[in-house]
């Protein structure tokens, strides 16, 4: 990150198409490597599915990196960081989403593409573990975050929130094995 314009070794400017192609290649490579782990949501998928997921990861990594920056900060380009599955990155959030979908699928819960938010009846909610409470409180902040993003027109605030959700879910996933529960 030397803050100079992004150029190829030959001195040419880097095109968005070439940047996305490299991000897709790295995303696919990482997805394929992770699919070897039996615990991975991508384990057992065929080549076509792995390619599609790798493509989505690569493109979303670049988009997330762009949207996550506050407008007042310098733009520092680091493709390795962008496609990483750790830290404040799009792939980290996508991986959390894949984990959530995998849990729901294993539990036999079908989630429609679009979810309506009906008014829920008030009921006591017992959250016995700190990780459960933290995740619930983080999720409850969503309407306020969306209103704040709409008011300020700063998508970086939504990215920060999604990162917090993914991190809270990661702790919850590690500390509260819901599918192993007898309840």
State each model region's role.
Residues 1-183:
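Non-catalytic interaction-recognition regions
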């Amino acid at each position: 990150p030397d803050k100079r314009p992004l150029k190829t070794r030959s001195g040419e400017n880097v095109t968005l198409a070439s940047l996305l192609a490299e991000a897709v290649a790295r995303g696919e490579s990482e997805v394929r490597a992770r699919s070897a782990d039996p615990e991975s949501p991508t384990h057992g998928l065929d080549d076509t599915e792995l390619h599609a997921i790798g493509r989505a990861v690569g493109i979303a990594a670049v988009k997330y990196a762009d949207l996550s920056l506050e407008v007042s900060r310098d733009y520092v380009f680091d493709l390795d960081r962008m496609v990483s599955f750790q830290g404040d990155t799009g792939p980290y959030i996508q991986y959390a989403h894949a984990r959530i979908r995998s849990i729901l699928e294993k539990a036999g819960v079908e989630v429609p593409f679009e979810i309506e938010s009906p008014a829920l009846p008030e009921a006591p909610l017992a959250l016995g573990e700190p990780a459960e409470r933290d995740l619930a409180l983080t999720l409850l902040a969503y309407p306020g975050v969306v209103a704040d993003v709409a008011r300020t027109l700063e998508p970086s605030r939504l990215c920060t929130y999604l990162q917090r959700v993914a991190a809270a879910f990661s702790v919850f996933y590690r500390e509260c094995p819901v599918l192993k529960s007898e309840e």
